Amino acid sequence: MIEIIMLLCYNVFMISPRRDILIRRIDRMNITYIYHSSFLVETDSCYYLFDYFRKQLPKLNTEKPIFVFASHFHQDHYNKKVFELLKQQGMKNIHAILSKDISKRNYPETDGIEITRVTFHQHYELPCGTELQTLHSTDSGVAFLLTCPEGTIYHAGDLNDWMWKGEPEQENRQMTGSYRHEIQLLAGKTIDVAFLPLDPRQEEYYAEGMRYFLEKVDVKTVYPMHYWGEPEIIDRFLSEYPEYRHIVKQTETWQ
């Protein structure tokens, strides 16, 4: 795990005594990047953990509830081992929010975990004053839009404009249309923090999904994800689209 924490509060940078932790204050949420597409968001009342795949989790406050979100069944977005890790830490109140495409045989095997199965284009009321809206992924499962007392959080999962070199033009056009339809559902909302795919495997199409999102959605801060160990793709995006430097940040350094 790259243990980097962002405290959303006053738009100020702080460096902790540990050299590998950089803290950015913007509002009232602490955000830790875990790995790939996984992030931990801490508020005053609870934790939200998105798309855990692998790597170590930070030390958690066992008195707080934790909501574990899994956007779909792909192995780089869901690993039921996360529930064992949480139990090992002594977490007492664990609530899993799992996309319906995740097989029940891959549900947590430990007792005392509440499970909510979710599907696309639905609204759900969660504890801690949290509202959840789901979008339809262009790949598998859902994307998550959370509204909590501390702000609004968007985690795309695999909702992206998955255009690929060599694919039939018609399929790429259909993909773009499907993606844009979903993003337009966010029109009129203000999102405080968004976690969006920026995948170098798409080659010349790598920026299409993020660029459209930034054009259409009122978002304050974006952290790219799903870049398969190549954070240099963020530098490329910011070089090609410098107008978004004040929004799109370096995920592994928060710069």
Report residues per predicted region.
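Core dinuclear metal-dependent hydrolase active-site scaffold
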Residues: 15-63, 114-190, 252-255
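Binuclear metal-ion centers of metallo-dependent hydrolases, dominated by the metallo-beta-lactamase
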Residues: 29-36, 95, 108-124, 206-255
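Structural motif
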Residues: 49-50, 69, 153-156, 195, ...
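Active-site metal-binding motif and surrounding structural segment of the metallo-beta-lactamase
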Residues: 54-101, 184-195
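Active-site environment of divalent metal-dependent phosphoester hydrolases
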Residues: 55-57, 74-78, 102-106, 140-142, ...
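A short, acidic, amphipathic alpha-helical segment used as a generic capping/interface helix at domain edges
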Residues: 178-185, 203-212
